[in-house]
Amino acid sequence: GRDRDPIRDKWQLFVLSGPSGVGKDAVLSLMRENGLPLHFTVTATTRPQRLNEVDGVDYFFYSDSEFAAMMVDNAFLESAIVYGYRYGVPKGPVNQARDQGIDVIIKADIQGAASIRTEAPEAVLIVLEPPDIPELTRRLAERMTETSDALKIRIATAQREMVEGAKLDHRVVNRNGRLD
């Protein structure tokens, strides 16, 4: 394991949450680049892989049947269906990091964060929010990964998630050009 700070003698589980398009991946990428001493979990999903994504780095991409088998094996800390696809946080890497005394950060939607809180009450839940809904709409539209109807659904979901996110431990606004 790594040297532990004597002030913090116990393992920490952090969950970074927020609506789709708020910048969770960008924040986690910056944290990695800055060498933060954390284990960054990789989420499993059944959704199609996007052009710029690497299997095992951005997500673990599985078929519906592979994912279902993993659920039967109780392989996920939490799992959910989001926008028609399955997502889950594999338990194995989280448990390995915990056993080595390495703090863990998980990316999850608001629903996932609530599920993780049930499984791990000690988890620190952080919600990342956009400065406002028009900005979130712009970010999602720029990704060009959704149809107009799908974009409307994501925005409506984001508005509900922001209300739920207010119940988490910490709120952080991801302003344009202020990622650092």
List the model feature ranges, each with a label.
Residues 2-3, 7, 138, 145-146, ...:
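NTP-dependent small-molecule kinase module
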Residues 13-15:
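Short hydrophobic/aromatic beta-strand immediately N-terminal to the Walker A/P-loop
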Residues 17-19:
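P-loop (Walker A) phosphate-binding loop of NTP-binding proteins
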Residues 22:
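ATP-binding Walker
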Residues 25:
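Walker A/P-loop
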Residues 32-41:
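Post-Walker A helix-loop "phosphate-sensing" segment adjacent to the P-loop in P-loop NTPases
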Residues 43-104, 110-111:
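ATP-dependent small-molecule kinase phosphotransfer cores
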Residues 104-109, 119-142:
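Conserved phosphate-donor/acceptor-positioning beta-strand/loop module used by diverse small-molecule
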